[in-house]
Amino acid sequence: MNLIRIELRKMKMGWYIRGALIANVIIMGFMWLISYSEKADGGVSFQSTDEAFLIIGTFVRAVFIVFGAVLIVKLVISEYKNKTILVMFTYPISRKKLLTAKLMIAGGLTFITILLSNILIAAGFFWLNSICHFIPGELTSEIISQQAVKMAVFAFGAAGTSLVPIFFGMRRHSVPATIISSVVIVMLISSTSPGFSISSVVYIPLSLAAFGLFFSYMAIRNADKQDA
């Protein structure tokens, strides 16, 4: 835990918090814009509350999987690339423990941010829906409890998925490879059609999360062999 606190202090979280808030505002604004424009044309933006939750979740996970890759770049890849991690390797701390702390920060922040963003954007959207009635039907306590469980499960899956780019980034300590691989992953899992998203099939994000955890384990295991 001390290592995690040190890394968080060193990283300076301001940029991440600002970026997350801006992303939340943009996603919420986009959801409102879609709903308003469809209603103005006499149509319905979402057929049900489930579909609205699906679209919100897809947007949030897509954005913050890429944010997760940026965290990996700042915490791991760029430090290897710029040789600054050599300084930390001189400390009486295991390389494996150091890398574990960094990846726990990346995965943990991604999980928390996705979960909170889902809650915030859904709350804002359905508050507006209660006034403007974009979506037919009511938001019941049963729907809310079901969606809360889904949010937690998919946030975990997305957090694990956000670690997959470390496999590509650590090969040559490449920042572009890390970011581009996260974008490709998002493109592959975020394709949607009315009422369906590939990423909404729980086995897909959980399988990718397993890959992310495995690649993280491999990076940690090879930390002592990895030249900075």
From Swiss-Prot:
Superkingdom of origin organism: Bacteria
Coiled coil: none
Keywords, in A-Z order: Cell membrane, Membrane, Transmembrane, Transmembrane helix
Record membrane topology: Multi-pass membrane protein
UniProt keyword annotation of Membrane present: yes
Location within or outside the cell: Cell membrane
Pfam families (UniProt xref): ABC2_membrane_4
Full protein name: Uncharacterized protein YcbO
Organism: Bacillus subtilis (strain 168)
Gene (UniProt): ycbO
